[in-house]
């Protein structure tokens, strides 16, 4: 008899049984956990998960949220709430300097400029009247002095 009519699993030790719905997702290898003789990896990780779950339930938030503090509409910290911030011109003085993504902004700006140039080139290509000017970036036969200027021409 492995299960009851209610669907709960009967184990030899019900105090350590954690229902799968309450168990957190895989959080990787636990290097801080010391494995003792006779203690399996599963029971040690289950103990670690249970400790993590109890700390989250006791504090009502994840202990891993001390990383990036991003403004939200609802937060336990009043300084993070967007409605708490200044609404006048002073809001630009304290504008955040962080970004949520690790991006190369100079490269993103170059790509934006290239996209605009490509759109202008497309407009020139579609133009039948000849009134739209060419984009110099896309003129293929480039003269040698434009690409490799002589040292006396650079001055």
Curated annotation (Swiss-Prot):
The keyword Cytoplasm applies. It is found in: Cytoplasm, Cytoskeleton, Cilium axoneme. InterPro entries: CIMIP2C, CMI2A-C-like_dom. One of its GO terms (cellular component) is axonemal microtubule. Keywords: Cell projection, Cytoplasm, Cytoskeleton. Microtubule inner protein (MIP) part of the dynein-decorated doublet microtubules (DMTs) in cilia axoneme, which is required for motile cilia beating. Belongs to the CIMIP2 family. This is Ciliary microtubule inner protein 2C. It comes from Xenopus tropicalis (Western clawed frog).
